[in-house]
Amino acid sequence: MQQVTIGSRTFSKILCGTNAFWGHSHFSEARNAEYRNRFDDRTIAGTIQRCLDAGVNTVESCANGRIVSILAQLRDTNRTSLHFVGSTRIDETSAMNSHQQKLSFLIEHRADICVIHAQYVDRPSSGDSIGGLDRMVDTIHEAGLLAGISTHRVETVERCERRGYGIDTYLFPLNLSGFVYPEYQGKETVQERIDVVRGVSKPFILVKVLAAGRIPPSEGLPFIAETAKPNDLISLGFGSEDEASESLSLAARLF
């Protein structure tokens, strides 16, 4: 498994994504319910363990106590480094209901990369700035951690680069179909997404690379291998332990 260094931290090229763990399928309510029923703490830990066994050393998730507890147990069991990329996404996984609360939680629990979620940075704005983002990035850096944002929009990446916010990495959707999430209203083309990823030297953490299960790994991962920069990371989610093993076996041949 290739590795990528950001700042003083070294991450596996592939990250373990967690949307399925929390019942976020971006497909249907029935699949959401199926995932919620399947993924108790033991099954989540088993799936992450499969990733660890395949050389993955990083988990990407929204901030919540459940994932922090599971990661702590896995660190104790494996006696190995296990990085955490945590976002301030506000959802049903936690009672925390503000991005500031989520950020404080991530800093307290030493998330290697603290990610300000698209819910915050993609909000409509009357000017070119993103209110409060500079202070949040400074707070993350003052804690000795890496700062990221997640965004669905090309224009948000371009805005952050123009404003010089000091962001270390961007979580950003890229796949061969252009899928972002159901009912997404943005008009970016796949080529425009590729252009911003390749045009910005900073590392991206590419998400939705299989379009939330709509693209087979045998098609989606080669596309990412051809389009991503050498310093970009890829977050992959899995619906089961065996699915993790299958996808990571293919990824190991590509990355």
Model-derived features: positions:
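Short, acidic/polar
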Residues: 33, 38-51, 94-107, 153-159, ...
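N-terminal binding-site loop/beta-alpha segment at the start of enzyme catalytic domains
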Residues: 1-76, 220-223
